[in-house]
Amino acid sequence: VHKWGEHDLVSAIVQEPIGLSAGRMAALQLSKGEWVAITDIDVRPEPNWIEELLNSSQSQGDENVMAVTGRTVFAKSSDTVSLIRSVEIESKYRSRPRITSLANGPCSMFKRECLLNVGGFNPEWYHAEDMEVSLKLIASGGIIVYSPDAVVNHVPETGIGRFLSKRSRDARAHVRIVRNYPSKNRKRPGFD
C-alpha cells in the first residue's frame, strides 16, 4: 500500500481495521476530485471502468446526476453456489433501468460535493452503506444512473456456509435500511 502512495496522484491511507464504511469516508474526506469512485477488495475493475462511469455521468435534461453505478459480473466456479449466484446477479443487472435506486458499493462513482453534503459514508454502518448514501442522494434531489458497460469482475462466491452468512448479513442490513428509511419517506420505494 505504501508503494502505491509514492505516486504523485495517489494517496495511501493506513488505518486500523475499523470497517469498510469508515475507510470509504476517510478516502472521501481526503479526495480532491469532482467525482469519487469506490470498489471492493474482491472485485477487479475492467480497464475502462472509470471511463465508462464518466461517460454516463452527464445529466440529461433537468436531471441532477449525483452517482453512477456500474455492473458487477460474478465469476463462476464449479461450485453450485457460485453458479447460482452468478446467474442471479446477471439476471438482476439485465433488467436494471438507466435511472436506478442503488449505487452498488463494488462499482460506483459519486459526485464528491453531493456525497459530502448528505453526510458521506456513516462509519457506524457495517454493511449497506452504499444503500444508505443512495437513499440520501435521491432524497436530496439527485439521481443515480446505471452504466452497464462500466464492469467490475467479482471473485466467485463459493461454499454454502459463506453464502448463507453473507445473505444473513444482507438481511440484517435490509431490515436496518427499512427501519431507518421507511418506504413512505422515500422518493422511490423500490430497491434494484
What is the predicted role of each segment?
Residues 1-14:
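Acidic donor-binding segment of Leloir-type glycosyltransferases
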Residues 36:
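Short aromatic/hydrophobic "clamp" motif used to bind/position activated sugar donors
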Residues 151-192:
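Active-site-adjacent helix/loop segment of glycosyltransferases
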Residues 40-44:
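The conserved acidic donor/metal-binding loop of glycosyltransferases
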Residues 108-110, 114-119, 124-151:
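A short, conserved alpha-helix in the catalytic core of glycosyltransferases
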Residues 74-76, 91-110, 126, 132:
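A recurrent flexible, glycine/aromatic-enriched loop bordering the glycosyltransferase active site
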Residues 48-80:
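Conserved donor NDP-sugar-binding/catalytic core segment of glycosyltransferases
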Residues 15-31:
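Glycine-rich, basic loop-to-helix element that forms the pyrophosphate-binding segment
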